[in-house]
């Protein structure tokens, strides 16, 4: 009599290819940056764990998740050059990064507040965040009032006669997609009369 055979589970060529591709992608990401010996040791730990996890993965989705997690961890490791940038930002002090302000009367009598500052020494910044408040020591909020790549800003909106406006500025550099900030500048303030 005919006995149907139990179908064998075929090996998943798609999964094998995904494993190979993911391992290659992680290794490529690790060698793309210029890491020193200590940083390379950190990267090697991540790679060894990821490669072991990929071998044991059961699905393509699992492999992709391992690859993405490993790449994210590798991206967090700062190179010597990036560490130097962070150190330079940390060394920018308020007195080195002063914000000046003045009230300007435009044609038609409208008054605006013009802010200017000097780029911090030793740092190639990507931009500046300006914070504004009507209180001297609070009310600046966590979100910047304005962001610019220039070393000046003219506040033309939401200005009322008799009010004093306080401003502080901080510079930032983008490293691995994240903003790293200097300390805030000394506050500048002006009263609209």
Residue ranges and their predicted role:
Residues 1-88:
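Beta-rich interaction/scaffold domains
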Residues 117, 130, 155, 167-169:
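An aromatic-rich alpha-helical recognition segment common to small helix-rich domains
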Residues 158-176:
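Beta-strand-rich modules
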Residues 121, 134-138, 175-177:
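Solvent-exposed strand-loop boundary residues in beta-sheet-rich modules
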Residues 59, 107-111, 147-153:
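Ser/Thr- and Asn-enriched, surface-exposed coil loops between beta-strands
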Residues 129-161:
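Recognizes extended acidic, P/S/T-rich segments that occur
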Residues 124-126:
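Solvent-exposed loop segments of extracellular immunoglobulin-like
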Residues 84-122, 179-193:
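Pro/Thr/Ser/Gly-rich low-complexity, intrinsically disordered linker/stalk tracts
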């Amino acid at each position: 009599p005919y006995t149907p055979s139990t179908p064998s589970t075929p090996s998943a060529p798609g999964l094998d290819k995904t494993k190979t591709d993911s391992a290659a992608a992680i290794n490529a990401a690790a060698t793309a940056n210029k890491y020193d010996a200590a940083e390379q040791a950190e990267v090697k730990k991540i790679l060894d764990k990821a490669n072991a996890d990929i071998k044991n993965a059961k699905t393509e989705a699992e492999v992709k998740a391992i690859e993405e997690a490993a790449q994210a961890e590798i991206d967090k490791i700062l190179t010597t050059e990036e560490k130097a940038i962070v150190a330079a930002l940390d060394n920018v002090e308020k007195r080195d990064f002063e914000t000046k302000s003045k009230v300007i009367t435009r044609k038609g009598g409208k008054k605006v507040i013009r802010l200017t500052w000097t780029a911090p020494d030793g740092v190639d910044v990507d931009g500046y965040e300006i914070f504004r408040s009507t209180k001297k020591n609070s009310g600046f909020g966590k979100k910047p009032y304005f962001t610019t790549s220039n070393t000046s800003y003219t506040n033309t909106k939401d200005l009322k006669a008799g009010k004093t406006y306080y401003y502080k500025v901080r510079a930032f550099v983008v490293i691995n997609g994240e903003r790293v900030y200097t300390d805030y500048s000394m506050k500048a303030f002006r009263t609209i009369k």
